[in-house]
Regions:
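N-terminal signal-anchor module of multipass membrane proteins
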Residues: 1-60, 132
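Juxtamembrane helix-boundary/capping and inter-helix hinge elements in multi-pass membrane proteins
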Residues: 4, 59, 84-85, 114
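Short, aromatic-rich membrane-interface segments at the entry and exit
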Residues: 25, 39-46, 67, 89-93, ...
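Alpha-helical transmembrane segments in multi-pass membrane proteins
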Residues: 43, 47-51, 55, 59, ...
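Short, non-helical or kinked segments that cap or interrupt transmembrane helices
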Residues: 61-76, 113-117
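Juxtamembrane boundary at the C-terminal end of a transmembrane helix
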Residues: 129-135
Length: 135
């Protein structure tokens, strides 16, 4: 996979939050969130990139990968981590761990024919909130 396609797939992952598979929609979502909260938008983009890269490195389903499916839950985790934990080394660590965990949960559900939608995002954020008692 070239770096150009990795960035393209990352933007598709952002757009998949609203069930779109379009790099321009992903870019517009990024710009809109950036306008409101610059750090949250960067966390979102980084989380989506990391999840996409991880899915590629462990050779997950190529069609799902190319359509950005492995990135959208991580995009949501990125925004939630910044919202609940702020900007710190700790939150970056959570972002990395959460991005990888969403991919693993999503792949488990996919292989077992479960509809997952945003369940990986919900489970990861609930886990983080429960572990670190921020309610």
């Amino acid at each position: 996979m070239s770096s150009k396609s990795l960035y393209t797939i990352t933007l598709k992952g952002v757009s998949q939050v609203m069930l779109q598979e379009n790099i321009y929609t992903g870019l517009l979502f990024f710009i809109a969130i950036f306008y409101v909260n610059q750090i949250a938008s960067l966390y979102m983009l980084l989380a989506t990139f990391l999840a996409t890269y991880f899915a590629f490195k462990i050779s997950l389903d190529e069609n799902s990968l190319n359509s950005g499916i492995y990135g959208f839950n991580a995009a949501l985790v990125g925004v939630a981590v910044e919202l609940f934990f702020g900007v710190s080394f700790f939150s970056i660590t959570l972002l990395i761990f959460g991005s990888v965990l969403t991919v693993l949960i999503q792949e488990y559900f996919r292989k077992n024919s479960f509809s997952f939608f945003t369940l990986p995002f919900i489970l990861v954020v609930w886990l983080f909130l429960w572990l670190f008692s921020i309610f």
